[in-house]
Amino acid sequence: MSHTFYNSLDSSCKSPFGAIPAGQAVTFNLTVPEDLGYVDPHLVLTKDRENPVHYRMEFTGQTPRVNHFTLTVTPTTSGLYFYHFDLYTDFRRIYRTPGGEGVLSWTEGQEWQLTVYEPDFKTPDWLKNGTMYQIFPDRFCEGKPNKEMPFADRIYRADKTGEPYFWPTEQDEGYLNMDYYGGDFAGIQQKLPYLRDLGVTCIYLNPIFEAHANHRYNTADYLKADPLLGTNEEFSALCLAAAREGIRIILDGVFSHTGSDSRYFNREGRYGPGGAYRDRNSPYRSWYDFDSGYPCGYRSWWGFETLPEVQEDSPSYVDFICGKGGVIDTWLNLGASGFRLDVADELPDDFIEKIRTAVKSHGDDKLLLGEVWEDATTKEAFGQRRTYLRGRGLDAVMNYPFRNAALDYLHGGDVAAVADALMQICENYPAPALDCAMNFLSTHDTERAITAIAGEPCNGRDRCWQSKRCIPADKMDDAVRKLLLGYAMIFTLPGVPCVYYGDEIAMQGYRDPFNRAFFDWNSTEQRLRGPIKTLAALRRSCDAFDGGRLEIVRAEGDVLHYRRVGKTQTAEIILNRGPHLLAEEAFGKNTEVNPGGFTVLVEDNEPEHVGYFSVY
């Protein structure tokens, strides 16, 4: 392999950049060295799982020692397309290498990707320059203290700083998750001024429906708030109070399974004689797949008997979730601004499309976010390529690839590879989806950010090892500095940053349940709050962070320097994970970046408006 002929990240080679709506013309420009002799280059474009189409490129002229070719094509249908270039008379092809560059190859290589999405794909504008905040409801704030438990099998935790319970003998079914710290709607409402001051514009709540585990992913009643959190009316009051603070609330939609301990399945008998498990004539029977071939007699989520899977093609289930007066209708009418779909990969595309229709019937400003751990444009699940990020399904997804890239950078990984990972997502995702992608460093499903960044690697160790393990006190200064560097990254990349509750006070914890401790409202760790607040304010005031394109300026050594280009402003972000003071040029001037620090500089795009907007 030799010489670069094409770079998909360069607008002089491919225009426009990245994904395009169906009906949009896209132009490819190829340069071929003269010393290769006569060539007849073709673009080979293949729609996913279809036959390739060869397009002959047009010769447009010469510059010294280089021949130029061009081609414009207009994909008319949405889908996933892949392409490379054939030179034909040279019997070689041009394939993609890291960084989007093309090289000559005698053998097959990696193709470029072209995502084509629905031309009417729109996503909520209110989210795009905002800041999200994820709350695990039982563990944030108790507004009505010293509760009586609504069910006898719940354990009330008055010791708010105590570690969440786990019992090693219960590993077959995980563990009971029956200890409750009492977090509630009243507590969240009480802390709305705190969240507003932090710069939060959207709260993402983990499940709030009645359920019999503290995580509430085993839904018992979709139409009723868990009584420990409050009533449906109190949830509605919370949404109204949040709106007055400029904050919207989205909910977790767990629609791939219910709890076995639910009014729908009712294996445990808590809900009387009915339910699909106990009554063959139950109206919920068609929701589930009962078969003696399953170890427990029914299909369950990843084999957990307490989580029977639903059949998302059951008409009565679809109507219950998506129909008038159904789950989506009920909670959006109560004041929610959208849903995050749990395990979106495990929901059929047509079911997600019906959910979208139900959500958007309440207005285009309602959000539908999906849990996807990989590149959502190329994701395959159960033998099917998923189509949910092309404009008919999800608005956006959780941006795990960006989290992985941020952690790789903070752990000393190859910076060029980090930059390539970032640009691949920017290149593959439709702009409406990228602008709403949820960027984060930690969630309820991952280690706490500071633990993942600076803690001893878990490496699959059990919960006994994870219990009470923390970063040594003499390492905390460095850990906090790295955590802030990580947050600077996710606040300034395309997408919407999300702070997991407690990250702003450097809460620690390995995997579930240690990443779900109660928020320490007496914490003296306040070093992160100010910078996070400032970054959130910068996002709201600078249009470079509202859909501005990403350009990599330099990615080598310990330096990751990138640019966001908006309609009226441009921002340059310089991250320095290294131990030495860095001098870097931005906007034609030298600026210094502290060891382990970052700098954000902003200029107006108009020639008469020059100079730095802000420096951190």
Identify the residue ranges that each predicted region occupies.
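Hydrophobic faces of well-ordered beta-strands that scaffold small-molecule active sites
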Residues: 131-133, 203-205, 249-251, 339, ...
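Aromatic-anchored helix/helix-loop segment that forms the rim or "lid"
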Residues: 419, 423-425, 459-484, 541
